[in-house]
Protein backbone atom coordinates (compact mmCIF):
# COMPACT_ATOMS: atom_id res chain seq x y z
CA UNK A 1 0.00 0.00 0.00
CA UNK A 2 1.42 3.37 -1.01
CA UNK A 3 0.44 6.64 0.61
CA UNK A 4 0.93 9.89 -1.23
CA UNK A 5 0.58 12.67 1.33
CA UNK A 6 -0.88 12.85 4.80
CA UNK A 7 -2.88 15.82 5.95
CA UNK A 8 -1.00 15.90 9.25
CA UNK A 9 2.48 15.49 7.80
CA UNK A 10 2.51 17.99 4.95
CA UNK A 11 5.51 20.27 4.62
CA UNK A 12 5.71 22.79 7.44
CA UNK A 13 8.43 25.42 7.80
CA UNK A 14 10.77 24.52 10.68
CA UNK A 15 10.25 26.35 13.95
CA UNK A 16 13.97 26.99 14.47
CA UNK A 17 15.68 29.11 11.80
CA UNK A 18 19.09 27.93 10.62
CA UNK A 19 20.35 30.87 8.54
CA UNK A 20 22.53 32.50 11.22
CA UNK A 21 23.79 29.09 12.37
CA UNK A 22 24.91 28.39 8.79
CA UNK A 23 26.67 31.76 8.63
CA UNK A 24 28.56 31.08 11.87
CA UNK A 25 29.75 27.78 10.37
CA UNK A 26 31.03 29.68 7.31
CA UNK A 27 32.84 32.45 9.23
CA UNK A 28 36.64 32.71 8.72
CA UNK A 29 38.82 30.94 11.27
CA UNK A 30 41.55 32.76 13.25
CA UNK A 31 45.07 32.52 11.87
CA UNK A 32 47.76 33.77 14.22
CA UNK A 33 50.71 35.53 12.57
CA UNK A 34 53.66 34.84 14.86
CA UNK A 35 56.69 37.07 15.28
CA UNK A 36 59.91 35.29 14.25
CA UNK A 37 62.19 37.33 16.50
CA UNK A 38 62.33 38.16 20.18
CA UNK A 39 60.50 41.36 21.09
CA UNK A 40 61.66 43.40 24.05
CA UNK A 41 59.14 44.52 26.64
CA UNK A 42 56.47 42.12 25.43
CA UNK A 43 53.57 42.10 27.94
CA UNK A 44 53.40 38.74 29.73
CA UNK A 45 49.74 38.25 28.78
CA UNK A 46 50.52 38.28 25.02
CA UNK A 47 52.14 35.46 23.10
CA UNK A 48 54.09 35.30 19.86
CA UNK A 49 51.29 37.12 18.05
CA UNK A 50 52.84 40.29 19.58
CA UNK A 51 55.11 42.04 17.04
CA UNK A 52 56.20 45.07 19.04
CA UNK A 53 56.14 48.62 17.74
CA UNK A 54 55.46 48.15 14.01
CA UNK A 55 53.54 50.44 11.66
CA UNK A 56 50.05 49.89 10.27
CA UNK A 57 51.56 49.37 6.84
CA UNK A 58 53.93 46.67 8.10
CA UNK A 59 51.07 44.92 9.89
CA UNK A 60 48.99 45.09 6.73
CA UNK A 61 51.72 43.34 4.73
CA UNK A 62 52.00 40.56 7.30
CA UNK A 63 48.25 39.98 7.39
CA UNK A 64 47.62 39.92 3.66
CA UNK A 65 48.17 36.15 3.53
CA UNK A 66 44.61 35.11 4.46
CA UNK A 67 41.22 36.09 5.88
CA UNK A 68 41.21 35.75 9.65
CA UNK A 69 44.92 36.52 10.05
CA UNK A 70 45.72 38.56 13.14
CA UNK A 71 48.57 40.04 15.18
CA UNK A 72 49.09 42.47 18.05
CA UNK A 73 51.26 45.56 17.76
CA UNK A 74 52.24 48.41 20.03
CA UNK A 75 51.08 51.82 18.88
CA UNK A 76 53.84 54.07 17.48
CA UNK A 77 51.79 57.19 18.21
CA UNK A 78 50.87 56.18 21.74
CA UNK A 79 53.53 53.87 23.22
CA UNK A 80 52.18 51.59 25.92
CA UNK A 81 48.86 51.07 24.14
CA UNK A 82 48.17 48.01 22.00
CA UNK A 83 46.24 47.30 18.82
CA UNK A 84 44.71 44.09 17.49
CA UNK A 85 45.16 44.04 13.73
CA UNK A 86 42.76 41.65 11.99
CA UNK A 87 42.27 40.73 8.34
CA UNK A 88 38.61 40.66 7.33
CA UNK A 89 36.81 41.50 4.10
CA UNK A 90 40.13 41.80 2.23
CA UNK A 91 41.23 44.68 4.43
CA UNK A 92 42.98 45.13 7.76
CA UNK A 93 40.85 46.21 10.71
CA UNK A 94 42.50 47.79 13.78
CA UNK A 95 41.01 47.61 17.28
CA UNK A 96 42.33 49.15 20.51
CA UNK A 97 43.10 46.18 22.76
CA UNK A 98 42.75 46.16 26.55
CA UNK A 99 43.57 43.76 29.37
CA UNK A 100 42.24 43.75 32.95
CA UNK A 101 42.77 40.08 33.70
CA UNK A 102 40.82 39.30 30.54
CA UNK A 103 41.20 40.54 26.98
CA UNK A 104 38.63 42.88 25.44
CA UNK A 105 38.02 45.41 22.70
CA UNK A 106 34.39 46.10 23.67
CA UNK A 107 31.96 44.82 26.30
CA UNK A 108 32.85 41.13 26.04
CA UNK A 109 35.78 39.78 28.10
CA UNK A 110 37.82 36.79 26.86
CA UNK A 111 40.26 34.39 28.49
CA UNK A 112 42.46 34.27 25.38
CA UNK A 113 43.23 36.35 22.32
CA UNK A 114 42.29 33.36 20.16
CA UNK A 115 38.76 33.30 21.59
CA UNK A 116 38.43 37.07 21.20
CA UNK A 117 39.42 36.85 17.53
CA UNK A 118 37.17 33.84 16.88
CA UNK A 119 34.17 35.65 18.34
CA UNK A 120 35.07 38.83 16.48
CA UNK A 121 35.28 37.05 13.13
CA UNK A 122 31.91 35.39 13.70
CA UNK A 123 30.32 38.71 14.61
CA UNK A 124 31.88 40.61 11.70
CA UNK A 125 30.92 37.89 9.22
CA UNK A 126 27.31 37.58 10.38
CA UNK A 127 26.74 41.34 10.68
CA UNK A 128 28.24 41.86 7.21
CA UNK A 129 26.25 39.10 5.54
CA UNK A 130 22.97 39.45 7.43
CA UNK A 131 22.61 43.04 8.66
CA UNK A 132 19.17 43.46 7.09
CA UNK A 133 18.05 40.02 8.26
CA UNK A 134 19.11 40.76 11.86
CA UNK A 135 17.31 44.11 11.80
CA UNK A 136 14.06 42.29 10.98
CA UNK A 137 14.47 39.31 13.34
CA UNK A 138 11.82 40.47 15.80
CA UNK A 139 9.10 41.02 13.17
CA UNK A 140 7.72 37.46 13.14
CA UNK A 141 8.32 36.02 16.62
CA UNK A 142 7.55 32.43 17.58
CA UNK A 143 7.27 33.27 21.27
CA UNK A 144 3.56 32.43 21.45
CA UNK A 145 4.22 29.17 19.58
CA UNK A 146 6.99 27.97 21.88
CA UNK A 147 4.99 29.37 24.76
CA UNK A 148 7.09 29.32 27.91
CA UNK A 149 3.78 29.75 29.70
CA UNK A 150 2.64 26.34 28.43
CA UNK A 151 5.21 24.72 30.69
CA UNK A 152 3.31 25.97 33.69
CA UNK A 153 -0.26 25.57 32.50
CA UNK A 154 -2.68 22.93 33.69
CA UNK A 155 -2.86 19.78 31.53
CA UNK A 156 -5.63 19.83 28.91
CA UNK A 157 -7.75 17.30 30.74
CA UNK A 158 -7.58 19.45 33.92
CA UNK A 159 -7.68 23.00 32.64
CA UNK A 160 -11.02 22.44 30.92
CA UNK A 161 -12.72 21.40 34.16
CA UNK A 162 -15.11 24.06 35.46
CA UNK A 163 -14.80 25.18 39.05
CA UNK A 164 -17.65 23.36 40.75
CA UNK A 165 -18.86 24.34 44.19
CA UNK A 166 -19.45 21.28 46.32
CA UNK A 167 -22.88 21.26 48.02
CA UNK A 168 -24.35 19.06 50.71
CA UNK A 169 -26.70 17.48 48.16
CA UNK A 170 -23.81 16.74 45.80
CA UNK A 171 -21.76 14.99 48.47
CA UNK A 172 -24.68 12.79 49.48
CA UNK A 173 -25.92 12.06 45.98
CA UNK A 174 -25.73 8.39 45.02
CA UNK A 175 -28.09 8.42 42.05
CA UNK A 176 -27.05 7.96 38.43
CA UNK A 177 -27.76 11.62 37.63
CA UNK A 178 -25.48 12.78 40.44
CA UNK A 179 -22.63 10.62 39.19
CA UNK A 180 -23.11 11.89 35.64
CA UNK A 181 -23.00 15.50 36.77
CA UNK A 182 -19.72 15.03 38.62
CA UNK A 183 -18.12 13.12 35.76
CA UNK A 184 -18.50 15.65 32.97
CA UNK A 185 -16.95 14.57 29.70
CA UNK A 186 -13.92 16.47 28.41
CA UNK A 187 -16.06 17.94 25.62
CA UNK A 188 -18.54 19.39 28.09
CA UNK A 189 -15.67 20.69 30.21
CA UNK A 190 -14.30 22.55 27.21
CA UNK A 191 -17.71 23.98 26.47
CA UNK A 192 -18.03 25.28 30.02
CA UNK A 193 -14.58 26.91 30.12
CA UNK A 194 -14.96 30.60 30.84
CA UNK A 195 -12.86 33.01 28.82
CA UNK A 196 -11.52 34.81 31.90
CA UNK A 197 -9.99 31.53 33.17
CA UNK A 198 -7.48 31.68 30.30
CA UNK A 199 -6.22 35.18 31.09
CA UNK A 200 -3.01 35.42 33.17
CA UNK A 201 -3.75 36.71 36.65
CA UNK A 202 -0.63 38.88 36.86
CA UNK A 203 2.32 40.23 34.93
CA UNK A 204 5.98 40.02 35.88
CA UNK A 205 8.92 41.61 34.10
CA UNK A 206 11.66 39.19 33.08
CA UNK A 207 14.95 39.49 34.96
CA UNK A 208 17.32 39.30 31.98
CA UNK A 209 21.08 38.94 32.51
CA UNK A 210 23.83 38.66 29.88
CA UNK A 211 24.60 34.96 29.55
CA UNK A 212 27.15 32.67 27.89
CA UNK A 213 25.49 29.59 26.39
CA UNK A 214 27.47 26.37 26.11
CA UNK A 215 26.66 24.57 22.88
CA UNK A 216 24.33 25.83 20.13
CA UNK A 217 21.36 27.85 21.38
CA UNK A 218 18.40 29.45 19.63
CA UNK A 219 16.45 32.51 20.66
CA UNK A 220 13.10 31.54 22.15
CA UNK A 221 11.51 34.76 20.92
CA UNK A 222 12.53 35.02 17.25
CA UNK A 223 13.74 31.39 16.71
CA UNK A 224 17.08 32.52 15.27
CA UNK A 225 20.50 31.20 16.24
CA UNK A 226 22.36 33.02 19.03
CA UNK A 227 25.77 33.54 17.48
CA UNK A 228 29.21 34.00 18.99
CA UNK A 229 31.41 32.24 21.57
CA UNK A 230 30.36 34.07 24.73
CA UNK A 231 27.62 36.45 25.87
CA UNK A 232 25.50 35.43 22.87
CA UNK A 233 22.32 36.73 24.48
CA UNK A 234 20.45 37.15 27.74
CA UNK A 235 18.78 34.68 30.10
CA UNK A 236 15.99 35.38 32.56
CA UNK A 237 17.40 34.61 36.00
CA UNK A 238 13.91 33.77 37.27
CA UNK A 239 12.37 31.58 34.56
CA UNK A 240 15.29 30.65 32.30
CA UNK A 241 13.98 32.23 29.07
CA UNK A 242 16.84 32.56 26.51
CA UNK A 243 16.69 35.37 23.93
CA UNK A 244 18.83 37.78 21.93
CA UNK A 245 19.54 41.06 23.69
CA UNK A 246 17.51 42.97 21.08
CA UNK A 247 14.64 40.47 21.37
CA UNK A 248 14.49 40.88 25.16
CA UNK A 249 12.98 44.33 24.60
CA UNK A 250 10.04 42.73 22.77
CA UNK A 251 9.22 39.92 25.22
CA UNK A 252 5.95 40.51 27.12
CA UNK A 253 5.90 40.75 30.91
CA UNK A 254 4.91 37.12 31.46
CA UNK A 255 7.77 35.75 33.58
CA UNK A 256 6.85 32.67 35.64
CA UNK A 257 9.42 32.45 38.47
CA UNK A 258 8.41 28.92 39.47
CA UNK A 259 9.86 27.68 36.17
CA UNK A 260 13.44 28.49 37.12
CA UNK A 261 14.25 24.89 38.00
CA UNK A 262 12.68 23.42 34.85
CA UNK A 263 15.13 21.73 32.51
CA UNK A 264 13.57 21.69 29.06
CA UNK A 265 13.57 18.52 26.98
CA UNK A 266 11.77 19.72 23.86
CA UNK A 267 13.43 22.38 21.68
CA UNK A 268 16.81 21.68 23.31
CA UNK A 269 19.88 20.82 21.23
CA UNK A 270 20.08 17.00 21.19
CA UNK A 271 23.76 16.70 22.10
CA UNK A 272 23.40 19.27 24.88
CA UNK A 273 20.44 17.32 26.30
CA UNK A 274 22.12 13.90 26.38
CA UNK A 275 25.27 15.39 27.91
CA UNK A 276 23.27 17.13 30.61
CA UNK A 277 21.42 13.93 31.52
CA UNK A 278 24.38 11.57 30.89
CA UNK A 279 22.34 9.34 28.57
CA UNK A 280 23.02 7.75 25.19
CA UNK A 281 19.82 9.12 23.73
CA UNK A 282 17.18 11.68 24.70
CA UNK A 283 14.89 10.23 27.39
CA UNK A 284 11.80 11.22 25.43
CA UNK A 285 12.90 8.98 22.53
CA UNK A 286 13.56 5.95 24.72
CA UNK A 287 10.41 6.33 26.80
CA UNK A 288 8.05 6.96 23.87
CA UNK A 289 9.44 4.06 21.84
CA UNK A 290 9.18 1.68 24.81
CA UNK A 291 5.57 2.72 25.35
CA UNK A 292 4.71 2.37 21.65
CA UNK A 293 6.29 -1.07 21.37
CA UNK A 294 4.61 -2.32 24.53
CA UNK A 295 1.07 -1.61 23.32
CA UNK A 296 0.91 -0.01 19.90
CA UNK A 297 2.72 -2.00 17.19
CA UNK A 298 -0.54 -3.43 15.83
CA UNK A 299 -2.34 -0.08 15.81
CA UNK A 300 -3.61 0.72 12.31
CA UNK A 301 -1.92 3.76 10.79
CA UNK A 302 0.73 3.93 13.52
CA UNK A 303 2.59 7.29 13.18
CA UNK A 304 0.27 8.26 10.28
CA UNK A 305 -2.84 8.85 12.38
CA UNK A 306 -2.69 12.01 14.47
CA UNK A 307 -3.51 12.23 18.14
CA UNK A 308 -5.38 15.06 19.86
CA UNK A 309 -3.04 18.05 19.70
CA UNK A 310 -3.86 19.36 23.20
CA UNK A 311 -2.90 16.02 24.73
CA UNK A 312 0.29 15.83 22.65
CA UNK A 313 1.15 19.24 24.12
CA UNK A 314 0.46 17.77 27.57
CA UNK A 315 3.03 15.02 26.96
CA UNK A 316 5.55 17.65 25.87
CA UNK A 317 4.81 19.65 29.01
CA UNK A 318 5.18 16.53 31.17
CA UNK A 319 8.67 15.81 29.79
CA UNK A 320 9.74 19.45 30.15
CA UNK A 321 8.46 19.53 33.72
CA UNK A 322 9.13 16.01 35.03
CA UNK A 323 11.85 14.60 32.76
CA UNK A 324 12.23 10.84 33.06
CA UNK A 325 9.48 10.77 35.70
CA UNK A 326 6.88 11.86 33.13
CA UNK A 327 3.89 9.51 33.13
CA UNK A 328 2.99 8.51 29.56
CA UNK A 329 1.41 5.18 30.46
CA UNK A 330 -1.90 3.85 29.15
CA UNK A 331 -3.53 5.08 32.36
CA UNK A 332 -2.72 8.67 31.38
CA UNK A 333 -2.91 8.45 27.58
CA UNK A 334 -4.95 5.53 26.30
CA UNK A 335 -4.63 6.60 22.65
CA UNK A 336 -1.21 5.46 21.39
CA UNK A 337 -1.37 8.18 18.71
CA UNK A 338 -0.79 10.74 21.49
CA UNK A 339 2.59 9.12 22.20
CA UNK A 340 3.57 8.81 18.52
CA UNK A 341 2.56 12.46 18.04
CA UNK A 342 4.72 13.51 20.99
CA UNK A 343 7.72 11.65 19.56
CA UNK A 344 7.29 13.25 16.13
CA UNK A 345 6.90 16.66 17.78
CA UNK A 346 10.17 16.15 19.66
CA UNK A 347 12.06 15.60 16.40
CA UNK A 348 10.29 18.49 14.66
CA UNK A 349 11.19 20.86 17.50
CA UNK A 350 14.93 20.08 17.47
CA UNK A 351 16.90 23.27 16.66
CA UNK A 352 19.44 21.16 14.72
CA UNK A 353 17.53 18.30 13.04
CA UNK A 354 18.33 14.66 13.83
CA UNK A 355 19.90 14.47 10.35
CA UNK A 356 21.96 17.62 10.73
CA UNK A 357 22.33 20.50 8.31
CA UNK A 358 26.00 19.59 7.73
CA UNK A 359 25.13 16.00 6.76
CA UNK A 360 21.95 16.86 4.84
CA UNK A 361 23.49 17.29 1.34
CA UNK A 362 25.21 13.88 1.53
CA UNK A 363 21.98 12.13 2.54
CA UNK A 364 20.07 13.81 -0.30
CA UNK A 365 22.88 12.86 -2.70
CA UNK A 366 22.52 9.20 -1.69
CA UNK A 367 18.79 9.26 -2.44
CA UNK A 368 19.46 10.44 -6.00
CA UNK A 369 21.86 7.58 -6.83
CA UNK A 370 20.34 4.79 -8.95
CA UNK A 371 22.90 2.02 -8.35
CA UNK A 372 21.87 0.18 -5.12
CA UNK A 373 25.41 -0.66 -3.97
CA UNK A 374 26.71 2.86 -4.58
CA UNK A 375 23.60 4.26 -2.92
CA UNK A 376 24.21 2.28 0.28
CA UNK A 377 27.90 3.21 0.28
CA UNK A 378 27.04 6.92 0.02
CA UNK A 379 24.42 6.56 2.74
CA UNK A 380 27.03 4.91 4.97
CA UNK A 381 29.41 7.83 4.35
CA UNK A 382 26.61 10.27 5.19
CA UNK A 383 26.02 8.57 8.54
CA UNK A 384 29.66 9.20 9.45
CA UNK A 385 29.02 12.94 9.22
CA UNK A 386 26.48 12.86 12.08
CA UNK A 387 27.51 13.78 15.64
CA UNK A 388 27.64 10.66 17.87
CA UNK A 389 24.46 11.47 19.81
CA UNK A 390 22.53 12.11 16.59
CA UNK A 391 23.82 8.90 14.99
CA UNK A 392 22.96 6.78 18.04
CA UNK A 393 19.46 8.26 18.25
CA UNK A 394 18.92 7.69 14.53
CA UNK A 395 20.11 4.08 14.88
CA UNK A 396 17.71 3.44 17.76
CA UNK A 397 14.80 5.06 15.91
CA UNK A 398 15.43 3.13 12.68
CA UNK A 399 15.62 -0.18 14.58
CA UNK A 400 12.25 0.69 16.11
CA UNK A 401 10.70 1.63 12.76
CA UNK A 402 12.01 -1.63 11.29
CA UNK A 403 10.11 -3.47 14.03
CA UNK A 404 7.02 -1.42 13.15
CA UNK A 405 7.22 -2.71 9.56
CA UNK A 406 7.26 -6.31 10.81
CA UNK A 407 3.65 -5.71 11.89
CA UNK A 408 2.63 -4.24 8.52
CA UNK A 409 -0.34 -6.61 8.11
CA UNK A 410 -1.92 -5.14 11.23
CA UNK A 411 -0.71 -1.51 11.22
CA UNK A 412 -0.55 -1.01 7.42
CA UNK A 413 2.74 0.86 7.78
CA UNK A 414 5.63 -0.25 5.58
CA UNK A 415 9.01 1.45 5.11
CA UNK A 416 7.68 3.64 2.28
CA UNK A 417 4.78 4.93 4.36
CA UNK A 418 7.02 5.59 7.37
CA UNK A 419 9.40 7.45 5.06
CA UNK A 420 6.53 9.74 4.05
CA UNK A 421 5.82 10.49 7.71
CA UNK A 422 9.38 10.81 9.00
CA UNK A 423 11.25 12.29 6.02
CA UNK A 424 10.37 15.97 6.64
CA UNK A 425 10.35 15.30 10.41
CA UNK A 426 13.97 14.12 10.66
CA UNK A 427 15.48 16.23 7.85
CA UNK A 428 15.27 19.93 7.06
CA UNK A 429 16.95 21.63 4.16
CA UNK A 430 19.54 24.25 5.15
CA UNK A 431 18.28 26.30 2.20
CA UNK A 432 15.96 29.21 2.98
CA UNK A 433 14.17 28.85 -0.37
CA UNK A 434 10.78 27.21 0.29
CA UNK A 435 10.56 25.78 -3.25
CA UNK A 436 13.95 24.08 -2.89
CA UNK A 437 12.82 22.61 0.43
CA UNK A 438 9.60 21.32 -1.13
CA UNK A 439 11.50 19.73 -4.00
CA UNK A 440 13.67 17.84 -1.51
CA UNK A 441 10.73 16.19 0.28
CA UNK A 442 10.62 13.16 -2.04
CA UNK A 443 14.33 12.54 -1.41
CA UNK A 444 13.88 13.01 2.34
CA UNK A 445 11.20 10.31 2.29
CA UNK A 446 13.44 7.99 0.29
CA UNK A 447 16.36 8.50 2.69
CA UNK A 448 14.25 7.38 5.66
CA UNK A 449 12.82 4.47 3.67
CA UNK A 450 16.36 3.30 2.80
CA UNK A 451 17.53 3.69 6.41
CA UNK A 452 14.64 1.52 7.63
CA UNK A 453 15.02 -1.19 4.99
CA UNK A 454 18.81 -1.40 5.44
CA UNK A 455 18.95 -0.74 9.18
CA UNK A 456 20.77 -4.01 9.89
CA UNK A 457 23.46 -3.22 7.29
CA UNK A 458 23.97 0.51 7.83
CA UNK A 459 24.12 0.49 11.61
Curated annotation (Swiss-Prot):
Residue ranges of every copy of the Rho-GAP domain listed in the record: 268-459
Designated name of the protein: N-chimaerin
CDD domains, A to Z: C1_alphaCHN, RhoGAP_chimaerin, SH2_a2chimerin_b2chimerin
A single GO cellular-component term on record: cytosol
Site entry: Arginine finger: 304
Function, as annotated: GTPase-activating protein for p21-rac and a phorbol ester receptor. Involved in the assembly of neuronal locomotor circuits as a direct effector of EPHA4 in axon guidance.
Disease: Duane retraction syndrome 2: A form of Duane retraction syndrome, a congenital eye movement disorder characterized by a failure of cranial nerve VI (the abducens nerve) to develop normally, resulting in restriction or absence of abduction, adduction or both, narrowing of the palpebral fissure, and retraction of the globe on attempted adduction. Undiagnosed in children, it can lead to amblyopia, a permanent uncorrectable loss of vision.
The organism's place on the tree of life at top rank: Eukaryota
Keyword Acetylation: yes
Post-translational modification summary for this protein: Phosphorylated. Phosphorylation is EPHA4 kinase activity-dependent.
Outcome when changing residue 252 to Q: In DURS2; behaves as a dominant gain-of-function allele that increases CHN1 activity in vitro; appears to enhance membrane translocation and CHN1 activity by destabilizing the closed conformation of CHN1 protein in response to phorbol 12-myristate 13-acetate (PMA)
The entry's keywords: Acetylation, Disease variant, GTPase activation, Metal-binding, Neurogenesis, Phosphoprotein, SH2 domain, Zinc, Zinc-finger
Gene3D superfamilies referenced in this protein's UniProt entry, alphabetically: 3.30.60.20, Rho GTPase activation protein (1.10.555.10), SH2 domain (3.30.505.10)
Binding partners and assembly: Interacts with EPHA4; effector of EPHA4 in axon guidance linking EPHA4 activation to RAC1 regulation.
GO molecular function term, any single one: GTPase activator activity
Residues carrying Phosphothreonine: 192, 340
GO process annotations (BP): ephrin receptor signaling pathway; motor neuron axon guidance; regulation of axonogenesis; regulation of small GTPase mediated signal transduction
Zinc finger residue extent: Phorbol-ester/DAG-type: 205-255
Tissue: In neurons in brain regions that are involved in learning and memory processes.
Domain SH2: 49-135
Coiled coil location: none
Modified residues (N-acetylalanine): 2
Amino acid sequence: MALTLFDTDEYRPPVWKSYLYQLQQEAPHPRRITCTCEVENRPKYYGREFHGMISREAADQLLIVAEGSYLIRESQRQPGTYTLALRFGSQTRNFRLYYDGKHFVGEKRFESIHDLVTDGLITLYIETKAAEYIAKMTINPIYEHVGYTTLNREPAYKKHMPVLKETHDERDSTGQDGVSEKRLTSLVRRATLKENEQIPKYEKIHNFKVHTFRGPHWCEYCANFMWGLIAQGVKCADCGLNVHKQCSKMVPNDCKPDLKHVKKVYSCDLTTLVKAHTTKRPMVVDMCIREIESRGLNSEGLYRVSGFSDLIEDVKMAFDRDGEKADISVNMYEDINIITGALKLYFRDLPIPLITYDAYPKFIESAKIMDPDEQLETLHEALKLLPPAHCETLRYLMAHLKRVTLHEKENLMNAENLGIVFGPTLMRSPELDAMAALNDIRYQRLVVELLIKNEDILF
